[in-house]
Design a protein with these regions (language model features):
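Alpha-helical linker/hinge and terminal dimerization helices associated
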Residues: 43-44, 66-81
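A short LG(V/I)-centered, amphipathic sequence patch enriched
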Residues: 41-59
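Short helix-boundary/capping micro-motifs
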Residues: 12-27
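Pre-recognition alpha-helix immediately N-terminal to the DNA-recognition helix
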Residues: 7-11, 65, 72
Length: 81
């Protein structure tokens, strides 16, 4: 679990679940964003995003809780700078 994964989840949420747009905004590759999110989901043992095939469809209920926690963590990290 790391801040990059948190940023990827946050940006995917901000970009209407569009991983390509999230990757562009973060200056990285879409497959890298997708892989990082999947790894975070596996580590946490929750599905953050519901998928249809490879596309993100919605944020799950557990995902909403994860996203809220990520937002708090990222805000606190920002306060350290």
């Amino acid at each position: 679990m790391n801040l990059h994964q948190f940023r990827f989840v946050q940006e995917a949420s901000r970009r209407n679940l569009n991983l390509t747009e999230a990757a562009k905004a973060l200056h990285t590759s879409q497959p890298g964003v997708s892989k990082a999110i999947i790894e975070l989901e596996e580590e946490l043992g929750v599905e953050i995003f519901a998928r249809h095939g490879k596309r993100l469809k919605r944020i799950t209920e557990p995902g909403q809780h994860v996203l809220k926690s990520i937002e708090v963590i990222m805000r606190e990290v920002g306060n350290l700078k």
